[in-house]
Amino acid sequence: MSWRTVVITKTSKLDYSMGHLVVRDVESTVKVHISEISVLVIESTAVSVTAALLCELIKKKVKVIFCDEKHNPLSELTPYYGSHDCSLKIKRQIAWNETVKQCVWTQIVAEKIKNQAKVLEIYKLPQSSMLMGYIDELELNDKSNREGHAAKVYFNALFGKSFSRNDECPINAALNYGYSIVLSVFNREITANGYLTQLGLFHDNMFNQYNLSCDLMEPFRPFVDIAVKDMNPHKFEKEEKISIFNLLNDEFKIDGRTQTFINAVKIYCKS
């Protein structure tokens, strides 16, 4: 079972040899068996990667994330085919019933708000009960935008009344970074299950390649929020990014069994 998150932060060459990712830099050579790797993040732009390695990573369904010169996630490696019956699944996805899509989206919003309420409860914030009230007011497809109202109450309670998601600050940098990583994990699982990330339940932006991922990840956003709240960043640099990545190895209970964050996403996407 893959479980490692490997982050490449400095000038190096990545190669493939006998089932291993080989990382060479001026100081050392390190090998990691590909079967152990769940996510590979290439944070530095001064990294060279062989085509042989990329092919093996794709075959083993390792999520590869490339960052820009500011070390922010920019793109990812996604296979054309993730399942032997993907053509059949895509046909079914295209034909998804509109009412069913709306019902599923309503449930996703309910779970997201519920998790946000649990986060506020963890920090003993009274607005938790207000968010639970929004769940009772939910309409089909969230026509009254309870999600938006809940978000405003939630973020102001969690990070202060002066906080805005539009601000350029370390907290938002950490949140956006974390959400990008979670989105990438969902992209991998959706593709691995043979579906298109472009065709969503609610999100329907013609310029967004990840509409379905944006839909399904919503209940998982609060886990990033907790990590950022506990971090309380006054800057967002290498140390803070590593802390965000550690979220992928956090453990959860599902049906009485302990699962990592990545495995929890895998189970969720298959359900």
What is the predicted role of each segment?
Residues 1-41, 49:
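Short, extreme N-terminal leader segments that mark the start of a protein/domain
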Residues 3-5, 11-12, 26, 59, ...:
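Active-site helix-to-loop segments that bind/position phosphate- or nucleotide-bearing substrates
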